[in-house]
Amino acid sequence: MTQDSVTIKLDQFLKWVGAVNTGGEAKLLIQDGEVLVNGAVETRRGRKLGVGDVVRVRGQSYEVAEDGEA
């Protein structure tokens, strides 16, 4: 993923990095305010993430990186 490329939705990103097993699990964590994006609680599962965004869930941090790396 590059700065000018397509973004990824928060719930999809959580599944992609293995933080959750299902979209339903992602939805519940996000709705319950257990997911932070760049240090702020995010309750929109459709929030679009771009390169450099940092997602924190269940004590783990994941940074959106270029070329499909997390």
Question: Where do the model's predicted regions map?
Answer:
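A detector for short, charged/polar N-terminal pre-domain segments
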Residues: 1-6
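A basic, amphipathic helix-loop patch mediating RNA/tRNA/ribosome contacts
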Residues: 8-51
